[in-house]
């Protein structure tokens, strides 16, 4: 098995094949020249750092029935584990609540990441071996088309102040996603 993670140029005509080759070899790929700018990422990161450092986050506690909103520190544990993950996070859905102290950059990022995800799924469709793709019930991109269940999970791993974490770790392996 090849364990070389490829760097794939988003703008290259070979991108779909290179991307799938890297996924098949390692399960990963690095994408360069993608449409998400560093300045946008920096602004989003800054907004959410401010949000997680504020008490306003508690105004957006998650709704149990639809899972949107803020999930406090130690609110989740991985399937099959008893210890809590040492993180807090916020689920953003297209129809969900959105913190008033977070700028519009996150919504732009959400749209861009949706586009990027669609494109990568299209590459997998295009470059997958025929014996694999014929088992798909439909194209991968059509499986997520017009769904309101795509979410953006913004995660914060606060500094650990107490080194005695009682077996808790930053994030257990999650096999339920």
Residues covered by each model-derived region:
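Peripheral, non-catalytic segments flanking oxidoreductase cores
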Residues: 1-177
